[in-house]
């Protein structure tokens, strides 16, 4: 696979984890799992088999730049990006992609949050590698989802269409934003 670049989104304030997470020191920088590593450090650790830290980019709030430098000291300073303004996910991704495109016009880009809970790291790496292999020679975007085990109203759902030429990779019919409980139950039943 060629020129893999990874964007790690780390700008949120983690208000749902208060009082552990505060606006000055949000959850992505805290050892919430009790393993001696913060969530962002665990994210970098599980991505290292995919690409080197030199090819990872963190997009964060200006006031968290120092924390990122402390927690990921081997990341190039130029790869730690301060969002000009907190505008949520899409502008964060666009900003980082623009920076990457200037240095790596043919990059195969992964976007991930800094605070995802990943239990089965080897399966995550396998799926991510498969997605990168698929996108390496196509003009395609792959989104990775997990099959829900129960109806959940706090997350969006991916409605899968037909299988592509690659096993486990489906075309997306639609993204269904956070549904009410009745709709979530219908998604689980289908």
Locations of the language-model features?
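Conserved core of the sugar-phosphate nucleotidyltransferase
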Residues: 121-190
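Conserved beta-strand scaffold positions in the cores of enzyme catalytic domains, especially
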Residues: 29, 80, 141-143
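Short alpha-helical oligomerization interface
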Residues: 24-30
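Structural signal for conserved beta-strand scaffold positions within catalytic alpha/beta enzyme cores
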Residues: 31, 82, 174-177
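Short glycine- and Lys/Arg-enriched binding-loop motifs that mark or flank ligand-binding interfaces
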Residues: 7-10, 150-152
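Conserved N-terminal catalytic core of the sugar/cofactor nucleotidyltransferase
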Residues: 1-8, 16-19, 23, 34-113, ...
């Amino acid at each position: 696979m060629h020129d893999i670049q990874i964007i790690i989104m780390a700008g949120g304030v983690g208000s749902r984890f208060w009082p552990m997470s505060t606006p000055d020191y949000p959850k992505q920088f805290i050892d919430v799992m009790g393993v001696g590593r913060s969530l962002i450090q665990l994210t970098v650790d599980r991505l290292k088999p995919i690409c080197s830290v030199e090819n990872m980019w963190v997009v964060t709030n200006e006031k968290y730049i120092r924390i990122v430098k402390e927690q990921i000291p081997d990341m190039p300073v130029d790869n730690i990006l301060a969002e000009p303004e907190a505008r949520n996910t899409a502008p964060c991704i666009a900003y980082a992609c623009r920076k990457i495109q200037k240095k790596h016009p043919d990059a195969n880009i992964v976007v991930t949050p800094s605070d995802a809970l990943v239990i089965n790291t080897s399966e995550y790496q396998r799926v991510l590698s498969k997605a990168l292999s698929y996108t390496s020679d196509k003009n395609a975007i792959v989104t990775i989802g997990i099959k829900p085990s129960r109806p959940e109203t706090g997350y969006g759902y991916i409605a899968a269409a037909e299988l592509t030429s690659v096993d486990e990779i489906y075309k997306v019919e639609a993204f269904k934003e956070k549904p009410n409980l009745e709709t979530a139950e219908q998604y689980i039943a289908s």
